[in-house]
């Protein structure tokens, strides 16, 4: 019996060394979410916005091969003043001929305009899901990439000024990714994945409709792998088309980009999106872990995704 146990132990060690794939820690990602939310609302021009920028920059400077800061100015629809924004780009394995982008926005919405309580409609939101969740996943990926270098070039891009737009005017949103796409600081990006609103406790991720048009091959590969890995949040159905940071990447930079997003937060009957209820209690480590697991698979198990 003792020899069987030793054999099984050695087999497990061999397999873990053979794969070289690190384990995504959902609790660490959730802690990243909590730390962002502790700064309060992070809408452009706020104290929280400045504080979380420093938080992200300080963290990735310790973890990435190099960090680029892309500064820009932008207007918020209906306001006379100009705002300063910063896209934060954490790069790994710059010499690889294959460069991919995984991105998320780090700002939060200035107004809870979808809140049923009208007295809240001009208040800024905490943005635990819509703002902190994608960043939380990226920061955990940054930690793993430091510990286990990838065979391809990974560019973790934290986009600013995504969520200060108004309904009916798409380009009043996504100011950071629009600027990035028109002024590319990185050459040769093969494809891109945007993570947005991925912390919902009731996470359900259909295929975003634009993504299917922009990069059908990547969509099929990711959702197929999610099924293989039994990551239940990824649903094999096509959802609505959403204007998100992947659209400027495709339209202005020609980067085949997709969006992983659960816009029905938390479900079709209740709405926390753009309300004062977008708080950490309505997010979970388990949801972040599901998305993070698939991103780890995408980064390290390249045989399923191409060179």
Name these PLM-found stretches:
Residues 20-23, 38-47, 75-79, 121-131, ...:
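Second-shell loop/turn segments in exported
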Residues 89, 99-103, 127, 155-158, ...:
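Structural recognition of the beta-strand scaffold that forms the well-ordered cores
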Residues 71, 201-307:
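Active-site-adjacent substrate-binding region
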Residues 1-4:
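Positively charged n-region of N-terminal signal peptides that target proteins for export
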Residues 11-24:
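Bacterial Sec-dependent signal peptides at the C-terminal "C-region" and cleavage site
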């Amino acid at each position: 019996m003792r020899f069987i146990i030793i054999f099984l132990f050695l087999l497990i060690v061999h397999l873990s060394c053979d794969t070289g794939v690190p384990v995504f820690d959902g609790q660490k990602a959730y802690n990243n979410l909590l730390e962002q939310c502790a700064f309060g609302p992070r809408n452009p021009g706020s104290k929280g916005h400045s504080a979380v920028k420093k938080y992200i920059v300080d963290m990735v400077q310790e973890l990435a091969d190099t960090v680029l800061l892309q500064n820009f100015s932008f207007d918020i629809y209906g306001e006379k003043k100009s705002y300063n924004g910063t896209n934060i780009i954490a790069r790994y394995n710059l010499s690889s001929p294959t460069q991919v982008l995984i991105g998320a926005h780090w700002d939060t919405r200035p107004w809870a305009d979808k809140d049923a309580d009208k007295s809240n409609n001009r208040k800024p939101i905490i943005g635990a899901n819509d703002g902190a969740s994608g960043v939380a996943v990226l920061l955990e990926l940054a930690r793993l990439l430091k510990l286990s270098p990838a065979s391809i070039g990974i560019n973790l891009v934290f986009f600013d000024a995504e969520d200060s737009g108004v309904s009916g005017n798409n380009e009043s949103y996504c100011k950071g990714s629009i600027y990035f796409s028109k002024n590319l600081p990185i050459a040769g990006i093969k494809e891109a994945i945007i993570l947005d609103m991925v912390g919902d406790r009731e996470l359900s991720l259909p295929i975003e409709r634009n993504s299917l048009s922009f990069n059908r091959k990547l969509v099929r590969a990711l959702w197929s792998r999610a099924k293989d890995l039994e990551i239940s949040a990824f649903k094999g159905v096509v959802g609505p088309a959403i204007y998100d940071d992947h659209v400027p990447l495709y339209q202005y930079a020609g980067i085949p980009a997709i969006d992983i997003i659960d816009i029905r937060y938390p479900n079709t009957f209740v709405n926390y999106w753009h309300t004062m209820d977008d708080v950490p209690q309505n997010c979970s480590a388990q949801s972040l872990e599901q998305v993070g697991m698939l991103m780890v698979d995408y980064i390290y198990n390249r045989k399923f995704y191409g060179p």
